[in-house]
């Protein structure tokens, strides 16, 4: 799935409602069979506790930082889901559900969850809680991802030991009791994986690689498409020298000590590693789905706070604004913005909130305070926030 960002627009109500603004946006951006947007819906913003202008400005700055933090955290959660699901051949959309809805369905029917985010709290208290929860979800899923990666790495190593070539795979299923020297104080076995193209050279030279190599002791144990496995009997006191010379000759030494029951032990370890990897994967994906859903909900609630604070700073008190959320069609963003700028140009010429803010510092007017904010690099006469779709694209 690849979609454009969601846009949340807030403008003065002038006696209208969110539904009326939806109708306005549809008239503006949908013309006959040509539509610049794929969906538009009311974005209901409840009334929050409003403090002084100084506090609102501080909250605006803090919300901007928290919005960026939350977007980054959710994007990382999303990346973990996509990377993990791709390796498990799952259906991505199942992990990007929000309260059993797609992100589009959730934002299009957004309603403030007052049982989760209590309205008797201040804006800062609510935003702090949302941010803390989302960052906690990110940290938790990173920890679970690390645990899964460790389990997966352990299982892959086990697989390599069972299915690799003779220079890598376990020898427990290859070496038998009759292939090794038992109970000798002087003799030991050295196991060597010899490249196929060097086998003749090895057989002609192994007895002279070092002193005290038992003549004609080389025994072929197995062969694959790349290597042939031999065991050679040498005296223990020259084993290290023999190993060094063998490596210099481009042979691969296999460190192995025969033990009764080793084959069964390794098979049990392999089975345990497979079960653990599967369990950790299931746990990671289950938690990732929860983490995305809960974090996305929190993020949209944070966007709601952003809309409220910026609308009051822009349009004044008491709160009297309407807001909608819509999704531009691909490559139509510039055209939509120009249409909105034309439609709401009067807001730049005659700011609504100049004389409506009450209980603020009388030494600083709203215009001066807003000038200090530098909220956006590009000034817009209306309040506009985006919900970047990259965090839930799949």
Swiss-Prot record:
Pfam families: V-ATPase_C (PF03223). One of its GO terms (molecular function) is ATP hydrolysis activity. GO terms for biological process: vacuolar acidification. It is found in: Cytoplasm; Vacuole membrane. Its main location: cytoplasm. InterPro entries: ATPase_V1-cplx_csu, Vac_ATP_synth_c_sf. It is a peripheral membrane protein. The keyword 4Fe-4S does not apply. The keyword Hydrolase does not apply. GO terms for cellular component: cytosol; vacuolar proton-transporting V-type ATPase, V1 domain. Keywords: Cytoplasm, Hydrogen ion transport, Ion transport, Membrane, Phosphoprotein, Transport, Vacuole. The modification Phosphoserine is found at residue 17. Belongs to the V-ATPase C subunit family. V-ATPase is a heteromultimeric enzyme composed of a peripheral catalytic V1 complex (components A to H) attached to an integral membrane V0 proton pore complex (components: a, c, c', c'', d, e, f and VOA1). Subunit of the V1 complex of vacuolar(H+)-ATPase (V-ATPase), a multisubunit enzyme composed of a peripheral complex (V1) that hydrolyzes ATP and a membrane integral complex (V0) that translocates protons. V-ATPase is responsible for acidifying and maintaining the pH of intracellular compartments. Subunit C is necessary for the assembly of the catalytic sector of the enzyme and is likely to have a specific function in its catalytic activity. Reversibly leaves the enzyme after glucose depletion, causing the catalytic subcomplex V1 to detach from the V0 section. This is V-type proton ATPase subunit C. It comes from Schizosaccharomyces pombe (strain 972 / ATCC 24843). The lineage of its organism: Eukaryota, Fungi, Dikarya, Ascomycota, Taphrinomycotina.
